Amino acid sequence: MAPNYAKKCPVMGKAPSSGHSSIGPQDVHTLEVLSNFNREKIPERVVHALGAGAYGEFEVTHDISDICNIDMLLGVGKKTSLVTRFSTTGLERGSSEGVQDLKGMATKLFTSDGEWDWVFLNFPFFFIRDPVKFPDMIHSQRRDPQTNRLNPNNFWEFVTENHESIHMVLLQYSDFGRMFTWRTLSSYSGHAFKWVMPDGSFKYVHFFLSSDRGPNFKDGAGTIMDSSEPDFASRDLFEAIERGDHPSWTANVQVIDPKDAPHLGFNILDVTKHWNLGTYPQGVEKIPSRPFGKLTLNRNVKDYFSEVEQLAFSPSHLVPGIEASEDPILQARLFAYPDAQRYRLGRTLSKQASPRTSSTAEYQASLGKDFAEWVAQVSSDVWSQPHEDDYKFAREYYEILPEFRSQEFQDRMVERIVESVSQTRQDIRNKVYRTFALVSSELATRVQEGVEGAEIGQEKNVQARL
């Protein structure tokens, strides 16, 4: 017997059109088969379209009850089931997982208080701090609407007109921006969140997952991908779990008292900056982290479409004890993610009612004028404009690389930038040189000499063939 898609009664075989001379309303089974086929696929995600996923669990490993009132995180040894989806960002399904861009690691935790989504990226900061720029930023990294090919002119024009993105660009073009495997990917919330106590007091937190295996690059070896296998990371993840080699991540949290937030030397609500773990920049207070749990993936999915492709993540999926901060990019994501899922999955998308925590408004009012003025910065006219910190963070990242990693690590970053900028128009190149000069004269010179030197070399090769 063949299945009946209406789930009302079985159908004897798949006889052609049930013996009728034409397909009409009476031929219910054929119409159901065709209508089901027409609906097998759904629109792909507008970002993070290419992905892989697996099931697992989260276990609390350290007591953090002094700063946290989230039930899932209270009690060492408490376990919570979860599903995680890894993804690239800009390109479509079918593209290579090794593309040099942001990678996503989104986790849905099935807590006793509801679903809590951790929508993380593999970098601790982002390109922009003004959400109105997000569509232009994504479009600049996608295929050109005329040629349907990647166009470096679009990307570098965006960078040179939005200097807050330089910090992120340098990280993306380094080995950190290359794919290793999903199992060695660390990921970060990026945004500040609020962990709220029963009395309404709160701490600003940034939490992240450190891979217990990675990063696994050494002298660039880990950045070499087999272009003939675009899904190499998905295969690696699936096969590792199948053989019992379960990948795991340590969950860590950085904590800031709101009274201290206005005096840190940078604004933690600016997602183009990272919370200093002690590496860089100088003059910015170190914000140490503390571990609190372990995430382990231990079971593969059976049906990718229903179990991974139809997952709907959003940073608005919260549980009691956590609230979103005033970060403008985070605030925009609270709307954009559910809206994108409604478009992608339709009206049948289950509506998740996120329980509200106790209000922090009264507590915030008690923090005084300095705090109020600090929060108000995110809605000021100058928030979106470039300022010295945009160049400072990028400059110190560039300068610390030889010590933090190696000279070769820094060299490879410059080489990749040169390779990309070499594919742009001369007017764009000149803007790139001027932009990098605001960060480091050495960096600007290396990029310019690399690009123009390659151009001269190509011209000589052409002349030699004539």
Curated annotation (Swiss-Prot):
GO terms for molecular function: catalase activity; heme binding; metal ion binding. Its EC number is 1.11.-.-. Its cofactor is heme. It comes from the Eukaryota. Transmembrane segments: none annotated. Pathway: Alkaloid biosynthesis; ergot alkaloid biosynthesis. The active site is at H48. Residues 1-22 are annotated as: Disordered. Heme binds at Y337. Catalase; part of the gene cluster that mediates the biosynthesis of isofumigaclavines, fungal ergot alkaloids. The tryptophan dimethylallyltransferase ifgA catalyzes the first step of ergot alkaloid biosynthesis by condensing dimethylallyl diphosphate (DMAP) and tryptophan to form 4-dimethylallyl-L-tryptophan. The second step is catalyzed by the methyltransferase ifgB that methylates 4-dimethylallyl-L-tryptophan in the presence of S-adenosyl-L-methionine, resulting in the formation of N-methyl-dimethylallyl-L-tryptophan. Keywords: Alkaloid metabolism, Heme, Hydrogen peroxide, Iron, Metal-binding, Oxidoreductase, Peroxidase. This is Catalase ifgD. The gene is ifgD. One of its GO terms (biological process) is hydrogen peroxide catabolic process. One of its GO terms (cellular component) is peroxisome. Belongs to the catalase family. SUPFAM superfamilies: Heme-dependent catalase-like. The keyword Oxidoreductase applies. Pfam families: Catalase. InterPro entries: Catalase, Catalase_AS, Catalase_clade1/3, Catalase_core, Catalase_haem_BS, Catalase_sf.
